[in-house]
Structure formats: structure tokens, C-alpha cells
Amino acid sequence: MEQDEKTGFSFMNQPGLINIDVTGLCNKTCNYCPRSQGYPNQKEYMDWKLFRKFIFDLENYTGMIDFTGRGENSLHPDFGLLVKLLHHPARKYKTRIISNGYRLEQRKHYFEEFDVIIMNSYDSEEKMEERRKILPQATHRYWNQNMKPEEWGETPIQVSNRSDIFNRIA
């Protein structure tokens, strides 16, 4: 993964974002999720050995690795091991996790390893505040699931597969 023989291009030296999704399993059905309504919620997990190979191949990568996707990565049975592998001492990249925070209390020490932590919540502002007390350094985003399209304001595009609203253009 060093350099393309024809072009000389090396992805490792390019700033950017790599998204790692280690499970398709999620414990919520958030209306802002990119998963479609019929997306299967399956107990399938990336093997930690494959994850390790992927991470070590990125040893010289200098961008951001985003630990998020179409599942809640903290539900992976080897979440702690994956976080440890992701944060090996030789890494040059930054890490970010985006989570719904429902496993935060039990796994706080793993979440604290990330350079950027984003907690999404749509239950209530009170639940968000509870999570904020557990992990104050995280960015907490509250999404009101009951908000109607006419209340969205002038945002040009809204994507919300869970609520069956696709690409609303103002």
C-alpha cells in the first residue's frame, strides 16, 4: 500500500478521512441515520485479525480514521481490542468515533482514547446531558426526532432514511 507503480501516488501522505465500520449491528433506529428502513440489523462483525492488518497497513497514513458507519461500533464484542489496535504507538493518524453513546458508561475508558469523540442522541436533551457528564470532552449532538420537515429551516438538503424522507431540497 506504499505507492502506485504507474502514477507514483501514495494515499498515505494525503490528508483525508477513512471510515471503518466493524459491525452492521445497531442498538437504535435513529431518524438521521444513513441506514435505510429495511437495512438488516445483523450480528456480523469484522474479524479483529483483518482489522489489525488494515490498521498496520495504514501505519504511515496521516489523515483521520473515522470509527463509525452503519452500525454502532461499540457493540463489537472485541471493541476494546480494536480500540487498542487502532491506537498503537507508531500511528501518525488521528482518530474519531461517532456513537450513540448507549454503551458509554461501561466503555468510557475506550472512548477516551479517541482524538475526537462525537455523541449523537435523539432520545431527549436530558439523556444527552447524562452522557455529557460522563464524557464532557465529547461533542454532543442532539437530534430532535419529532421535528417536522417544515421546522427544518432553510437547510438545503436533509437526508433521513429512517423517517422515510429522502433528499429534501429547499
Each language-model region and where it sits:
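Conserved alpha-helical substructure of the radical SAM core
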Residues: 1-113
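Radical SAM enzyme [4Fe-4S]-AdoMet core and its adjacent flexible, acidic
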Residues: 21, 41, 46, 64, ...
